[in-house]
Structures are given as structure tokens and as C-alpha cells.
Amino acid sequence: FNLWPVAVKMVLLLVMIVGGCAGSTAGGIKVVRTALLFKLGRREIRHTFQPRKVQVVRFEGKGVEEGMLSQVAMFFCVYVLMLLLGAFAISLEGRFDVETNLTAALTCLSNVGPGLGAVGPVENFSGYGPFAKLVLSLLMLAGRLELFPILALFHPAIWRKS
């Protein structure tokens, strides 16, 4: 694993971020959301060159509603934010390098196999302290249960009596 070229490790990280298919128990952003993100990005680039043209994002031959596209974009932003905040939080312990901390957060948030560095396939998370393990556990829950239901728990409207 550690002898692999950097390009192969980058491909592995990208696959870890994408995760599995929609409806599966796999974590990650999911294949459908990733495809929609690329289509949305392509539309926005085209929009800069033809700002007056109405361009509909199509998926499997059907137009995708703007609300769905904004939800996908928001999910991606929240995913990246949680990944970076999680990696930063566990790096506060100062025990491991950036590669290890970032891939540890990614493996937990995406619920995939081993990371890189000190959390690689022949290593484990035992080198982290209690605070980092708590953060990583929360990332695992957020990744497994999807991000928005977890974030909804912290919304005040959920806890108000109706």
C-alpha cells in the first residue's frame, strides 16, 4: 500500500469519496450524486459562455429539477465541510500527519476500508486519543446514516412541541 504510486492512491481516494450506489448501504457521496454534480458543473461552465440560454440538466433522459440539483450541491458542500472539520479536529491531537488524519476522517465518513499512512491496511486507529476517536465515531455515524438526518437532529424545530 505504501509502495503504491501517488496517482494510484489519488484514484483510491476519489473512489472512497464517491462510495457506492444510491440505495446501498455504502457510504460516500454516491454515484448518482457524483454524476449530477458533474452535470451541474458542466451546465454552470456552459452558462458562463451562454448566459441567456436555458439549459436543463438531464439524467437518464429526464430533466432534473432545480431543487434536486441544489440539494445535491448542498450535500456535497456539507460532506466536504464535515470531512475537513473532522480531519482538523483529529489533527488537534498532533499525533499524525495530514495524510493520515485526512484519510482517517474520509474512511470514517465514507464507511470504507483502510486509509493511508498510519491508518493503512496493516495499521489501525489505536494511535488516536479519546477525543479523536469520538470525532471519528461521530463521522462514522454521520456517514452511515446520511448527513442530513444527523444534522436535522440539531435543528430546534425537531425538539419543539407542536
Residue ranges and their predicted role:
Residues F1-S162:
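Membrane-proximal intracellular helices of multi-pass ion channels
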